Amino acid sequence: MPGFPQTVFAHITKPVLATLIASVALAAASAAAAEAPPRQSLIFEGPGGRTPLTRWVMKRDPSDSGRGHGWVRGAFPGATVEVPNVVNATPYSGRAGAKNYLGSVAWYRTSFQAPAAGRYAIAFTSANYKAEVFLDGRPLGTHRGSYLPFAFQANLAAGAHTLVVRVDWRHPQRQAEEGFHRTWFNWGGLDGEVDVRQIGASDLQAPTIATTLAGTAANVKVGVQVHNDGVTRTVKPEGSLVRPDQTIPLSFPAVALAAGATATVTATAAVPQPALWSPASPNLYELDLAVPGESSYTARVGLRQITWHGQELLINGQRLKLHGATVQEDVPGHGDALSPADQDGIVADLKSIGANAVRAQHPLDPALLERLDAAGILVWQGVGPVEGAGMWYSNSSKLLSEAEQQVRTTATAAGLHPSIFAWNLVDEVAGNGRNAAEVGYVRESTRWLHAHDPDRMVAVDIWGRHPPTKAGPIYSEVDAVAETDYTGWYEHPHDTPAQLAARMRARLASMQRTFPSKVLVISEFGAESNTLNPPGKPGSYGFQAALLQNHIQVYAADPALTAMFVWVLRDYPLTPTFSGGSIHRVIKHLRLIEGLNQKGLFTYSGKAKPAAVTVAKLYKALPAN
């Protein structure tokens, strides 16, 4: 999995950093959780030598008594599961769903072999919500926050070791107040891949890549952090960019490093006749980095240059007009712990509607991002706290610092993906921001991203019911602005199509007046649909399809609009009591399925609705680039 810096959300227990030698665990417990022959990692990108830890024993602990029973040592029975795993994938509605939504505690146990004594890294892609990690019965570290990678290191003896993780996803409202509001069900567990690897005398971390086009060539700059775990010495990385018919060597300078020191080195190379990455041609190179005999890092990257001027977004010098849908990583029976087949299904659904872009409110799993890279689907990636519409909880200095660190962790971990074209800092900000803390977060994070990742846009997403008429300081430094538009659903659902189209055009004109120098995006539009409502009436499949057609035709005709995203690709579980929200104040006698957001183009089980056909016809008539 990608290299990343230690974050404020993960805490390593200090005694472990000094040394952690295997203690004797219960032989039966270790045997029960022993790893099957290691499979290939779900994630291509990352350091060399990783072994995925896939087979675990999981035990629910609703009374939170496992610690008192000594479960930190792995002495508990349970069910064998494959990680990534969600403990509470069902139910999501009714009384049982309401209880399930409140969260619980569970314990995971596995074992692995250290082939030789030395220093090892144990890396987690994600855990929801709080994770306590124990190795051979001793505390290794803690982490808080979903969809953020974290890792711990320990000195290990050769032989078998037992890894235990306690996961706590109780109190979803408290999660929101700590900067981790969830936009769908409160799934809990080890919802991302876990791996272990031995660390050599050096370690390569946080690689970066930037492409600048020059005539028929591409000038590529690659950076990587080199950490020295050996004695004071000089370290010289090597690298290359490789395609079947082309190999480009990367020449890094040697760097003098004290023991325990880290430095960033860069290499530049001119790539003649490059195979550029774009939605129309998603060509990929393999990036190979190494300190020979000590460490390595591999990823698939795309050479592409993203630029923007005023309201225009360009890739490789060509204007981009993007169309797609928002995605929630959620599949029946799996929650947000998606299998490779689940991720393939999401990409297939996006391609079936003709999408060349996708929006995500939460950081996407690295394996899904790799699939989007390969498919040529650009990503509007949400980072930082996700709040309810118009909300902002990160007001204390501690929470504000953590909010900024969320942004940095995600941007560092996902920085090599050519599909990501924008970092979205806030979801549905009201007006000019809720308070000075939110404004300060956006401005500070924008400056950091511009300094560390200047080849991507930084954006904010406006709550369409409360847009500003005059842009305040929260927008002064961002490059793009998005706005939700539920005209025809929450707003004016009984208007004629012509009246709705006029309202949409008026909204776009207002956006352009307020933000004349920003790239403009419609981040959400849509309507709930199922078979419970009369044909053609609000809540029916026909109503949804007709409304989406109206929106898309208006947006496609506006030359100043860069992107549009249907809300949402698939129906998904929200809160168990959700029944449409404020829509019942404007549409009487609407029938919706409790617990599900039904604005999807596909049902929760994956069946295409008529709107999917309508959207596909319209999207596929638009240019891919």
Predicted regions and their residues:
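Short glycine/proline/serine/threonine-rich loop/turn segments at secondary-structure transition edges
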Residues: A160, V271-E286
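Beta-strand-rich binding/interaction modules
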Residues: Y120, V133-L135, A217-A256, A263-T266
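Solvent-exposed, conformationally flexible loop/turn segments
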Residues: V105, A158-G159, A217, A258-T262
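Active-site mouth of glycoside hydrolases
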Residues: L148-A154, R174-W184, I306-A480, T484-T487, ...
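Short strand-turn-strand beta-turns centered on an Asx-Gly dipeptide
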Residues: F134-L140, P244, P292-G293, N316-G317
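Accessory beta-strand-rich segments of carbohydrate-active enzymes
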Residues: P37-P38, K59-P62, A98, G103-L204, ...
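Substrate-binding clefts and catalytic carboxylate motifs of secreted carbohydrate-active enzymes
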Residues: L42, G46-R67, W71, G103, ...
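Bacterial N-terminal signal peptides
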Residues: V16-A27
